[in-house]
Amino acid sequence: MPIRIPDQLPAADVLRTENIFVMSETRAAKQEIRPLRVLILNLMPKKIETETQFLRLLSNSPLQVNVELLRIDDRPSKNTPTEHLDNFYRQFEMVKNRNFDGLIITGAPLGLVQFEDVIYWDHLKTIMEWAKSHVTSTLYVCWAAQAGLKLLYDLPKKTRKEKLSGVYHHRIHKPYHPVLRGFDDSFLAPHSRYADFSPEYLAEHTDLDILATSDDAGVYLATTKDKRNVFVTGHPEYDPHTLHNEYIRDLGEGMEPAIPVNYYPNDNPDNPPIASWRSHGHLLFSNWLNYCVYQQTPYDLDHFSEEAFTKDE
């Protein structure tokens, strides 16, 4: 939440240079509060598991958040009961005429599938295009980050020879950027993907602010200048055993997956994994909600426009 101080307090300018949200008394007197509206487009097969993971992170904020769940189409799901989808998920036709403060697009197990071969690719493009004029800030996670970069920057799909799986060290590059508020200089986060996000490639072909990278995993966190698009190439939402379950699944399917890096104590899958990224995940989502959504979104979403975004005074 912002701190409220007298309009002319000298500390205000110093704090603003560090991108700390300072609210003047003049602005505070005019402010009204309402719940944030966040839409989650859940592309993962196990939707109940995934929605729980994201809701857990969204809940760790002093802001009131009203969440709605969106499905990409009406095809039957092999992993989620139809009753659950019918009761709790919206179709795009039900929300397309409304505006939202935030949109989260989850990952999807499509790392080796070309974009044009994804059965719902055209529909996903429609939703991402719709978000430009109906959503204040969109958070793209893992495969969705790759899809978003394709649609926004026309970046081709780049794939690693071996799947990236494990918990990797990352370092931050713009310590005063709002999304990095409170981050340690180095932090851990899980990855599970084939996509390759080279820092040099993204720096050359986009105007993104690259906020965090890993020597092994490449770019982890990047945003557009206006913070309306935030890309997370890993899985900060993962539960402690998610990587383990994926590893066991791949073994059961006759594959030869590598043991997830920096995950099991002594690299022994018989040892229960330790979740070393939980605090990072909560902080990342709290910062996204606060700095990319709450501080930028218009109070009256029915009159959404880029000009209506909150500006610092």
UniProtKB/Swiss-Prot annotation:
Location of this chain's protein in the cell: Cytoplasm
Keyword terms of this UniProt record: Acyltransferase, Amino-acid biosynthesis, Cytoplasm, Methionine biosynthesis, Transferase
Q: Which residues form the active site?
A: 142 (acyl-thioester intermediate), 235 (proton acceptor), 237
Which InterPro entries did the record assign?
Class_I_gatase-like, HST_MetA, MetA_family
Residue numbers marked as site, Important for substrate specificity: 192
Question: GO biological process: what's one of them?
Answer: L-methionine biosynthetic process from homoserine via O-succinyl-L-homoserine and cystathionine
Q: What class of enzyme is it?
A: transferase
What is the predominant subcellular site recorded for this chain?
Answer: cytoplasm
- One GO cellular component term: cytoplasm
What reaction(s) does this enzyme catalyze?
L-homoserine + succinyl-CoA = O-succinyl-L-homoserine + CoA
EC code: 2.3.1.46
Question: What does the entry list as the binding residues for substrate?
Answer: 163, 192, 249
Q: Hey, which pathway is this one from?
A: Amino-acid biosynthesis; L-methionine biosynthesis via de novo pathway; O-succinyl-L-homoserine from L-homoserine: step 1/1
Q: Does the keyword Transport apply?
A: no
> What GO molecular function annotation could you give as one example from this UniProt entry?
homoserine O-succinyltransferase activity
- Looking at the UniProt record, the site noted as Important for acyl-CoA specificity sits at 111
Q: Which family does it belong to?
A: Belongs to the MetA family.
Q: Which PANTHER family does the protein's record reference?
A: HOMOSERINE O-SUCCINYLTRANSFERASE (PTHR20919:SF0)
Function recorded in the entry: Transfers a succinyl group from succinyl-CoA to L-homoserine, forming succinyl-L-homoserine.
- Name of this protein: Homoserine O-succinyltransferase
What is the organism field in this record?
Vibrio vulnificus (strain YJ016)
Starting at the broadest rank, the lineage of the source organism is: Bacteria, Pseudomonadati, Pseudomonadota, Gammaproteobacteria, Vibrionales
